[in-house]
Protein backbone atom coordinates (compact mmCIF):
# COMPACT_ATOMS: atom_id res chain seq x y z
CA UNK A 1 0.00 0.00 0.00
CA UNK A 2 2.75 2.45 1.01
CA UNK A 3 4.78 1.59 -2.09
CA UNK A 4 1.82 2.43 -4.32
CA UNK A 5 1.10 5.65 -2.43
CA UNK A 6 4.71 6.79 -2.84
CA UNK A 7 4.61 6.08 -6.58
CA UNK A 8 1.54 8.15 -7.49
CA UNK A 9 -0.07 11.27 -5.92
CA UNK A 10 -3.53 10.03 -6.95
CA UNK A 11 -3.03 6.72 -5.14
CA UNK A 12 -1.69 8.60 -2.14
CA UNK A 13 -4.99 10.47 -1.88
CA UNK A 14 -7.06 7.34 -2.55
CA UNK A 15 -5.35 5.31 0.15
CA UNK A 16 -4.48 7.98 2.74
CA UNK A 17 -7.41 7.16 5.01
CA UNK A 18 -7.00 3.38 4.59
CA UNK A 19 -3.29 3.56 5.34
CA UNK A 20 -3.84 5.80 8.37
CA UNK A 21 -6.48 3.42 9.72
CA UNK A 22 -4.12 0.44 9.40
CA UNK A 23 -1.25 2.44 10.89
CA UNK A 24 -3.35 3.58 13.84
CA UNK A 25 -4.42 0.02 14.55
CA UNK A 26 -0.80 -1.15 14.45
CA UNK A 27 0.35 1.68 16.75
CA UNK A 28 -2.56 0.99 19.09
CA UNK A 29 -1.33 -2.54 19.73
CA UNK A 30 2.26 -1.35 20.14
CA UNK A 31 0.99 1.06 22.81
CA UNK A 32 -1.07 -1.65 24.47
CA UNK A 33 1.90 -4.01 24.63
CA UNK A 34 4.12 -1.31 26.11
CA UNK A 35 1.45 -0.39 28.65
CA UNK A 36 0.95 -3.99 29.76
CA UNK A 37 4.70 -4.39 30.30
CA UNK A 38 5.22 -1.00 31.94
CA UNK A 39 2.32 -1.50 34.35
CA UNK A 40 3.45 -5.08 35.05
CA UNK A 41 -0.13 -6.26 34.50
CA UNK A 42 0.85 -9.93 34.15
CA UNK A 43 2.77 -9.91 37.44
CA UNK A 44 -0.16 -8.26 39.21
CA UNK A 45 -2.60 -10.87 37.89
CA UNK A 46 -0.31 -13.73 38.95
CA UNK A 47 -0.03 -12.19 42.43
CA UNK A 48 -3.83 -11.86 42.66
CA UNK A 49 -4.36 -15.47 41.58
CA UNK A 50 -1.82 -16.74 44.12
CA UNK A 51 -3.53 -14.72 46.84
CA UNK A 52 -6.87 -16.17 45.76
CA UNK A 53 -5.52 -19.73 45.87
CA UNK A 54 -4.20 -19.26 49.40
CA UNK A 55 -7.51 -17.77 50.55
CA UNK A 56 -9.52 -20.49 48.77
CA UNK A 57 -7.49 -23.37 50.21
CA UNK A 58 -7.96 -22.11 53.78
CA UNK A 59 -11.45 -23.65 54.12
CA UNK A 60 -13.19 -26.70 52.66
CA UNK A 61 -16.27 -24.64 51.83
CA UNK A 62 -14.24 -22.27 49.64
CA UNK A 63 -12.39 -25.15 47.98
CA UNK A 64 -15.71 -26.78 47.21
CA UNK A 65 -17.10 -23.58 45.70
CA UNK A 66 -14.06 -22.13 43.90
CA UNK A 67 -11.64 -25.06 43.72
CA UNK A 68 -11.70 -25.56 39.93
CA UNK A 69 -12.30 -22.01 38.74
CA UNK A 70 -8.70 -21.02 37.91
CA UNK A 71 -7.94 -24.37 36.29
CA UNK A 72 -11.12 -24.12 34.19
CA UNK A 73 -10.17 -20.61 33.05
CA UNK A 74 -6.65 -21.78 32.19
CA UNK A 75 -7.95 -24.76 30.20
CA UNK A 76 -10.37 -22.53 28.29
CA UNK A 77 -7.54 -20.21 27.27
CA UNK A 78 -5.40 -23.18 26.23
CA UNK A 79 -8.22 -24.35 23.95
CA UNK A 80 -8.73 -20.82 22.68
CA UNK A 81 -5.04 -20.53 21.78
CA UNK A 82 -5.54 -23.38 19.29
CA UNK A 83 -8.12 -21.42 17.26
CA UNK A 84 -7.45 -17.75 18.06
CA UNK A 85 -5.15 -17.23 15.06
CA UNK A 86 -7.93 -18.37 12.73
CA UNK A 87 -10.34 -15.65 13.83
CA UNK A 88 -7.59 -13.01 14.01
CA UNK A 89 -6.40 -13.60 10.45
CA UNK A 90 -9.95 -14.04 9.17
CA UNK A 91 -10.75 -10.51 10.37
CA UNK A 92 -7.45 -8.80 9.62
CA UNK A 93 -6.16 -10.57 6.50
CA UNK A 94 -9.39 -11.64 4.79
CA UNK A 95 -12.24 -9.31 5.74
CA UNK A 96 -9.98 -6.27 6.25
CA UNK A 97 -7.24 -7.12 3.74
CA UNK A 98 -7.77 -7.02 -0.02
CA UNK A 99 -10.91 -4.96 -0.59
CA UNK A 100 -12.12 -7.09 -3.48
CA UNK A 101 -13.01 -9.93 -1.10
CA UNK A 102 -15.27 -8.06 1.30
CA UNK A 103 -16.80 -6.03 -1.54
CA UNK A 104 -17.84 -9.25 -3.29
CA UNK A 105 -19.28 -10.50 0.02
CA UNK A 106 -21.38 -7.34 0.48
CA UNK A 107 -22.56 -7.23 -3.13
CA UNK A 108 -23.68 -10.86 -2.99
CA UNK A 109 -25.99 -9.95 -0.14
CA UNK A 110 -27.32 -6.90 -2.02
CA UNK A 111 -27.95 -8.84 -5.24
CA UNK A 112 -29.65 -11.70 -3.39
CA UNK A 113 -32.09 -9.17 -1.93
CA UNK A 114 -33.03 -7.57 -5.25
CA UNK A 115 -36.77 -7.40 -5.97
CA UNK A 116 -38.10 -9.88 -8.51
CA UNK A 117 -37.72 -9.03 -12.21
CA UNK A 118 -41.49 -8.75 -12.41
CA UNK A 119 -41.29 -5.58 -10.31
CA UNK A 120 -39.05 -3.62 -12.66
CA UNK A 121 -39.45 -0.27 -10.91
CA UNK A 122 -38.36 -1.48 -7.46
CA UNK A 123 -35.60 -3.60 -8.98
CA UNK A 124 -34.30 -0.64 -10.96
CA UNK A 125 -34.19 1.55 -7.84
CA UNK A 126 -32.32 -1.16 -5.91
CA UNK A 127 -29.76 -1.62 -8.70
CA UNK A 128 -29.24 2.14 -8.84
CA UNK A 129 -28.34 2.10 -5.14
CA UNK A 130 -25.82 -0.66 -5.79
CA UNK A 131 -24.34 1.41 -8.63
CA UNK A 132 -23.92 4.39 -6.32
CA UNK A 133 -22.23 2.18 -3.73
CA UNK A 134 -19.92 0.80 -6.42
CA UNK A 135 -19.00 4.28 -7.69
CA UNK A 136 -18.05 5.26 -4.17
CA UNK A 137 -15.99 2.09 -3.76
CA UNK A 138 -14.09 2.31 -7.05
CA UNK A 139 -13.37 6.02 -6.61
CA UNK A 140 -10.67 5.13 -4.09
CA UNK A 141 -9.72 1.72 -5.41
CA UNK A 142 -6.58 0.57 -7.22
CA UNK A 143 -6.64 -2.99 -8.53
CA UNK A 144 -2.84 -3.30 -8.74
CA UNK A 145 -2.43 -2.53 -5.04
CA UNK A 146 -5.36 -4.73 -4.13
CA UNK A 147 -3.96 -7.66 -6.10
CA UNK A 148 -0.69 -7.36 -4.21
CA UNK A 149 -2.62 -7.15 -0.94
CA UNK A 150 -4.60 -10.29 -1.78
CA UNK A 151 -1.41 -12.24 -2.44
CA UNK A 152 0.27 -10.98 0.74
CA UNK A 153 -2.77 -11.51 2.97
CA UNK A 154 -3.45 -15.04 1.72
CA UNK A 155 0.19 -15.92 2.29
CA UNK A 156 0.05 -14.43 5.79
CA UNK A 157 -3.10 -16.40 6.59
CA UNK A 158 -1.65 -19.63 5.18
CA UNK A 159 1.53 -19.55 7.24
CA UNK A 160 -0.01 -18.30 10.50
CA UNK A 161 -3.19 -20.40 10.74
CA UNK A 162 -2.74 -24.13 11.56
CA UNK A 163 -2.89 -26.25 8.40
CA UNK A 164 -5.71 -28.42 9.78
CA UNK A 165 -7.86 -25.27 9.84
CA UNK A 166 -7.16 -24.26 6.23
CA UNK A 167 -10.09 -23.76 3.89
CA UNK A 168 -10.40 -25.83 0.67
CA UNK A 169 -9.35 -22.79 -1.39
CA UNK A 170 -5.78 -23.24 -0.14
CA UNK A 171 -5.69 -26.70 -1.68
CA UNK A 172 -6.17 -24.95 -5.04
CA UNK A 173 -3.14 -22.79 -4.30
CA UNK A 174 -1.11 -25.83 -3.23
CA UNK A 175 -2.03 -27.59 -6.48
CA UNK A 176 -0.40 -24.73 -8.41
CA UNK A 177 3.05 -25.67 -7.10
CA UNK A 178 4.19 -27.06 -10.46
CA UNK A 179 7.48 -28.25 -8.98
CA UNK A 180 8.20 -25.12 -6.97
CA UNK A 181 8.87 -25.46 -3.24
CA UNK A 182 7.25 -22.13 -2.34
CA UNK A 183 3.55 -21.58 -2.91
CA UNK A 184 2.81 -18.97 -5.56
CA UNK A 185 0.23 -16.67 -4.02
CA UNK A 186 0.98 -14.02 -6.66
CA UNK A 187 -0.16 -16.40 -9.39
CA UNK A 188 -3.40 -17.16 -7.56
CA UNK A 189 -4.12 -13.47 -6.93
CA UNK A 190 -3.39 -12.65 -10.57
CA UNK A 191 -5.96 -15.20 -11.73
CA UNK A 192 -8.56 -13.94 -9.26
CA UNK A 193 -8.24 -10.39 -10.60
CA UNK A 194 -8.11 -11.53 -14.21
CA UNK A 195 -11.40 -13.43 -13.90
CA UNK A 196 -13.35 -11.49 -11.26
CA UNK A 197 -16.18 -9.11 -12.11
CA UNK A 198 -15.14 -7.04 -9.07
CA UNK A 199 -11.59 -6.19 -10.17
CA UNK A 200 -12.63 -3.11 -12.16
CA UNK A 201 -15.52 -0.67 -12.26
CA UNK A 202 -16.09 -1.38 -15.94
CA UNK A 203 -16.55 -5.12 -15.43
CA UNK A 204 -18.77 -4.62 -12.42
CA UNK A 205 -21.03 -2.09 -14.14
CA UNK A 206 -21.40 -4.46 -17.08
CA UNK A 207 -22.43 -7.19 -14.63
CA UNK A 208 -25.12 -4.88 -13.21
CA UNK A 209 -26.86 -4.79 -16.59
CA UNK A 210 -28.02 -8.31 -15.84
CA UNK A 211 -27.06 -9.08 -12.21
CA UNK A 212 -27.40 -12.58 -10.81
CA UNK A 213 -26.43 -14.38 -7.62
CA UNK A 214 -25.17 -17.32 -9.70
CA UNK A 215 -22.57 -15.12 -11.42
CA UNK A 216 -21.26 -13.88 -8.07
CA UNK A 217 -21.16 -17.36 -6.55
CA UNK A 218 -18.95 -18.53 -9.42
CA UNK A 219 -16.67 -15.49 -9.11
CA UNK A 220 -13.13 -16.29 -7.84
CA UNK A 221 -13.05 -13.37 -5.38
CA UNK A 222 -16.33 -14.40 -3.77
CA UNK A 223 -15.37 -18.09 -3.80
CA UNK A 224 -12.13 -17.22 -2.02
CA UNK A 225 -13.68 -15.30 0.85
CA UNK A 226 -16.57 -17.73 1.28
CA UNK A 227 -14.31 -20.78 1.30
CA UNK A 228 -12.33 -19.30 4.20
CA UNK A 229 -15.37 -17.88 6.00
CA UNK A 230 -17.40 -21.11 5.71
CA UNK A 231 -14.48 -23.11 7.09
CA UNK A 232 -14.45 -20.77 10.08
CA UNK A 233 -18.22 -21.01 10.62
CA UNK A 234 -18.27 -24.81 10.37
CA UNK A 235 -15.13 -25.69 12.33
CA UNK A 236 -14.13 -22.75 14.51
CA UNK A 237 -17.11 -20.60 15.51
CA UNK A 238 -18.85 -23.36 17.51
CA UNK A 239 -15.66 -24.11 19.44
CA UNK A 240 -15.16 -20.40 20.08
CA UNK A 241 -18.73 -20.00 21.30
CA UNK A 242 -18.29 -22.87 23.78
CA UNK A 243 -15.01 -21.42 25.03
CA UNK A 244 -16.54 -17.98 25.48
CA UNK A 245 -19.47 -19.45 27.42
CA UNK A 246 -17.04 -21.31 29.69
CA UNK A 247 -14.97 -18.19 30.28
CA UNK A 248 -18.05 -16.09 30.98
CA UNK A 249 -19.28 -18.59 33.56
CA UNK A 250 -15.90 -19.17 35.23
CA UNK A 251 -14.91 -15.49 35.24
CA UNK A 252 -18.19 -14.61 36.91
CA UNK A 253 -17.44 -17.19 39.62
CA UNK A 254 -13.85 -15.95 39.96
CA UNK A 255 -14.97 -12.32 40.39
CA UNK A 256 -17.52 -13.44 42.99
CA UNK A 257 -14.68 -15.14 44.86
CA UNK A 258 -12.44 -12.06 44.63
CA UNK A 259 -15.24 -9.87 45.99
CA UNK A 260 -15.77 -12.31 48.83
CA UNK A 261 -12.02 -12.37 49.54
CA UNK A 262 -11.71 -8.56 49.44
CA UNK A 263 -15.06 -7.28 50.77
CA UNK A 264 -13.81 -3.72 51.32
CA UNK A 265 -12.25 -3.39 47.86
CA UNK A 266 -14.03 -1.29 45.23
CA UNK A 267 -14.48 -2.99 41.87
CA UNK A 268 -15.19 -1.15 38.64
CA UNK A 269 -17.67 -2.65 36.14
CA UNK A 270 -16.98 -3.65 32.56
CA UNK A 271 -17.39 -0.39 30.64
CA UNK A 272 -18.57 -2.03 27.41
CA UNK A 273 -22.15 -1.16 26.42
CA UNK A 274 -22.46 1.42 29.20
CA UNK A 275 -23.05 5.17 29.17
CA UNK A 276 -19.95 7.17 30.08
CA UNK A 277 -19.18 10.75 31.03
CA UNK A 278 -15.82 12.25 30.12
CA UNK A 279 -14.53 15.24 32.02
CA UNK A 280 -11.27 17.10 32.55
CA UNK A 281 -9.05 19.48 30.61
CA UNK A 282 -8.17 19.35 26.93
CA UNK A 283 -4.43 19.03 26.55
CA UNK A 284 -1.54 16.96 25.27
CA UNK A 285 -0.04 13.96 26.99
CA UNK A 286 3.27 12.15 27.51
CA UNK A 287 2.96 8.44 26.58
CA UNK A 288 6.63 7.77 27.23
CA UNK A 289 9.98 9.22 28.24
CA UNK A 290 10.77 12.41 26.27
CA UNK A 291 7.66 11.91 24.11
CA UNK A 292 4.93 14.56 23.94
CA UNK A 293 1.75 14.58 21.87
CA UNK A 294 -0.34 17.73 21.42
CA UNK A 295 -4.13 17.59 21.55
CA UNK A 296 -4.31 18.51 17.85
CA UNK A 297 -2.73 17.31 14.61
CA UNK A 298 -1.42 19.26 11.63
Which residues does each predicted region cover?
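Terminal presequence/propeptide segments associated with secretion/organelle targeting
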Residues: 1-298
